[in-house]
From Swiss-Prot:
The gene is CSM3. GO terms for cellular component: replication fork protection complex. Residues 21-46, 155-177, 191-230 are annotated as: Disordered. It comes from Coccidioides immitis (strain RS). One of its GO terms (biological process) is DNA replication checkpoint signaling. One of its GO terms (molecular function) is DNA binding. Residues 21-33, 165-174 have a biased composition (Basic and acidic residues). Its main location: nucleus. InterPro entries: Csm3, TIPIN/Csm3/Swi3. This is Chromosome segregation in meiosis protein 3.
Length: 337
C-alpha cells in the first residue's frame, strides 16, 4: 500500500502548480478573512484578556545648556581653580608667548570638557555674558577674598565659634568641617579670649586704682605713675620708657584763663618777695628819679654832722675819715647805688 502511494507520487507532476500560480494578494486576503495571521491572533487574545498593547518610546535627552548652574558645578570654575594650581605653570620672563599659548590651551581643554557643543570663542562669549549676573559677581568676590593672604588657614564655609555663646564647649554643635586640631585650639583659646575681653571692659568702666608706690609722699598734686600705662603689645614695636607716665593730652577746660593766670603769677611774685625779705637777701628797688635831690641832701647832712662821742668815754671829738667813708658806702649800698 505504501509502495503504491510512492509510485503515484513519482508520476504526479501537477502537484503544487496551482499554488505557485496563485496571486499573492488573494492569498493575503484569504488569510485576513480566515484570521490565520499570528498578529491578529495575538490581538484577539489580548482583547480577550483585557490588556492593551504598551508602546515604549524613548524620550530624547534635553540639550545641555551652559548656564550659571553648570558654570558653578564641580566641572565648572571650581575644577578650573583646582587644576590651575597643579597643571598650569609659567616659565616667566622671556617666555611670554609660550606662557600665553599654554594658558589658552588650558582654558580650551577645560571648556571643551564643560561644554563640548560650542566652539572655544562661542563658549567664551557665553561665559562673559554670565559673568555680569548678580550671582556670578558675588561668587567672584568670594573667590577673590579666598585668595587674599591670611584666608588659607581656615575654609571659607567654616563657621567659627563665638566665645560669648553658651554652646562653645559642646562638641556636637561644632562644625564637622573644622579639623580636629583647629577645633581643639578654638576651644582652648575661648576662655582666654573671654577673660581678656572682661579685663578690657573693667579697665574702661572702672577708675584706675593707685598703689602705694604711685601716691605722692608730700600730699596733693597728681599721682605719678611709676609704670608705663601704654599697651604692652606696643612695646614689641616701639620701645618706651617704663618710668614715664603717658597721660592723655590736657583738655581745653583744664587750661586756666588769662585772669586766673595773672592772679597766680602775682601771688607767686609776692610770696617770693616776702620770703626774700625774711631771709634778708632781697635788695630794695632803686629809688625813683624824683628822690635823687632828697638823697643828695641826706648825704650832705651826713657829711656835715659831727660824729657822736663813743660811749666808752674816749676823748676824741670826731671820728676818723675812714669811718665816714665806710658810713657813706653803707648808706649807698642800702639804697642800691
Amino acid at each position: 500500500m505504501a509502495e503504491d502511494t510512492a509510485f503515484d507520487d513519482l508520476f504526479n507532476y501537477d502537484a503544487g502548480i496551482e499554488e505557485l500560480l496563485r496571486d499573492p494578494e488573494e492569498e493575503k486576503n484569504d488569510r485576513r478573512a480566515s484570521g490565520t495571521g499570528t498578529g491578529s491572533t495575538e490581538n484577539k487574545n489580548d482583547d480577550l484578556i483585557g490588556l492593551e498593547e504598551i508602546k515604549i518610546t524613548r524620550k530624547r535627552a534635553p540639550p545641555v545648556k551652559l548656564d550659571e548652574n553648570r558654570l558653578l558645578s564641580q566641572a565648572g570654575i571650581p575644577k578650573l581653580r583646582r587644576s590651575a594650581k597643579t597643571k598650569l605653570k609659567f616659565k616667566g620672563k622671556r617666555h611670554e608667548f609660550s606662557d600665553v599659548a599654554r594658558l589658552l590651551n588650558f582654558y580650551q581643554l577645560w571648556l571643551d570638557d564643560l561644554y563640548p557643543r560650542a566652539k572655544f570663542a562661542d563658549g567664551l562669549s557665553i561665559i562673559e555674558k554670565l559673568g555680569h549676573t548678580k550671582r556670578m559677581q558675588v561668587m567672584r568676590k568670594e573667590w577673590i577674598d579666598e585668595g587674599k593672604p591670611g584666608r588659607n588657614l581656615y575654609d571659607s564655609n567654616v563657621t567659627y565659634l563665638d566665645p560669648n555663646s553658651d554652646n562653645r564647649g559642646d562638641k556636637d554643635t561644632a562644625d564637622p568641617t573644622i579639623p580636629s586640631i583647629f577645633q581643639r585650639t578654638l576651644e582652648q583659646s575661648a576662655p582666654a579670649m573671654e577673660a581678656h575681653r572682661n579685663d578690657q571692659a573693667e579697665s574702661t568702666h572702672s577708675p584706675k586704682r593707685l598703689s602705694d608706690s604711685e601716691i605722692p609722699i608730700f600730699g596733693g598734686g597728681k599721682a605719678i605713675s611709676l609704670r608705663n600705662n601704654a599697651d604692652d603689645d606696643d612695646d614689641l614695636f616701639v620701645p618706651g620708657n617704663e618710668g614715664m607716665d603717658i597721660d592723655p593730652p590736657v583738655q581745653a577746660s583744664q587750661v586756666p584763663e588769662e585772669d586766673d593766670l595773672d592772679t597766680f603769677l602775682a601771688e607767686q611774685e609776692s610770696t617770693m618777695q616776702n620770703t626774700a625779705h625774711g631771709l634778708g637777701i632781697l635788695k630794695p628797688n632803686a629809688p625813683p628819679a624824683d628822690e635823687e635831690d632828697d638823697l643828695d641832701a641826706l648825704l650832705a647832712e651826713a657829711e656835715n654832722t659831727p660824729a657822736r662821742a663813743p660811749k666808752t668815754g674816749h676823748l676824741e671829738a670826731n671820728r676818723p675819715a675812714a669811718d665816714d667813708f665806710d658810713d657813706e658806702l653803707h648808706i649807698l649800698n642800702e639804697f642800691g647805688l
